[in-house]
Amino acid sequence: MAKYNIGAVVAEFNYDITQMMLGLAKEEAKSRDCEITQVVTVPGVFDMALAIKKLLEKDEIDAVITLGAVIEGATDHDQIVAQHASRKIADLSLEYEKPVALGISGPGMTRLDAHKRVDYGKRAVEAAIKMCDRLNEI
C-alpha cells in the first residue's frame, strides 16, 4: 500500500511538455513509496481549479499535484493565467486542508525554457509528500 495517494491535474495545452512532467512525477512518487492514483487532464492551467476541487473531495486522495507549462505569447495572457490559477490553487489547499503542489512552470518563458523545466513534475511530488509528512506531525 502506498504511503500517500496523490491526484494529478495535468494541462493538455503544451501536451508534449506536460506529459514529460507527468512521467517524471510518477517515477518520483514510486521512488518515495507513494502513488499517483488518479490523473485528470484539463484543457489548460486556467481550467485546473474544478478538477483539483473534485480530487480534494475524495477521502482516498492525500494530496494533489498540478502540472502545466504557461508559455509567453504576444500579450500578457500568460501572466494573467498563471496569477489567477496559482491563487485559486492555494485557496483550494487551504479550504480542503490538503496539500496542492504547484508543478506549473512559467509565466514569461519560451517553449525551450519549458522543456528545460520539466523537472517541475518531480518537484511537485516532492513538495506534496513533504507537506503530507509535515501535516501529519502537527
Swiss-Prot record:
List residues binding 5-amino-6-(D-ribitylamino)uracil.
13, 45-47, 69-71, 102
Q: Name one GO molecular function term.
A: 6,7-dimethyl-8-ribityllumazine synthase activity
Q: Name one GO biological process term.
A: riboflavin biosynthetic process
Q: Which residues form the active site?
A: 77 (proton donor)
Which reaction does this enzyme catalyse, per its entry?
Answer: (2S)-2-hydroxy-3-oxobutyl phosphate + 5-amino-6-(D-ribitylamino)uracil = 6,7-dimethyl-8-(1-D-ribityl)lumazine + phosphate + 2 H2O + H(+)
Keyword Transferase present in the record's keywords: the answer is yes
Annotated pathway, please?
Answer: Cofactor biosynthesis; riboflavin biosynthesis; riboflavin from 2-hydroxy-3-oxobutyl phosphate and 5-amino-6-(D-ribitylamino)uracil: step 1/2
Q: Which GO terms describe its cellular component?
A: riboflavin synthase complex
Question: Per the UniProt record, which EC number(s) apply here?
Answer: 2.5.1.78
CDD domains given in the database record: Lumazine_synthase_archaeal
Matching SUPFAM superfamilies: Lumazine synthase (SSF52121)
**Is Thylakoid among the key words of this record?**
no
Q: Which UniProt keywords apply?
A: Riboflavin biosynthesis, Transferase
Which residues does (2S)-2-hydroxy-3-oxobutyl phosphate bind?
A: 74-75, 117
Pfam families in UniProt: DMRL_synthase (PF00885)
| Protein family according to the UniProt entry | Belongs to the DMRL synthase family.
Q: What does this protein do?
A: Catalyzes the formation of 6,7-dimethyl-8-ribityllumazine by condensation of 5-amino-6-(D-ribitylamino)uracil with 3,4-dihydroxy-2-butanone 4-phosphate. This is the penultimate step in the biosynthesis of riboflavin.
This chain belongs to the protein called: 6,7-dimethyl-8-ribityllumazine synthase
Per UniProt, what is the name of the gene that codes for the protein in this document? ribH
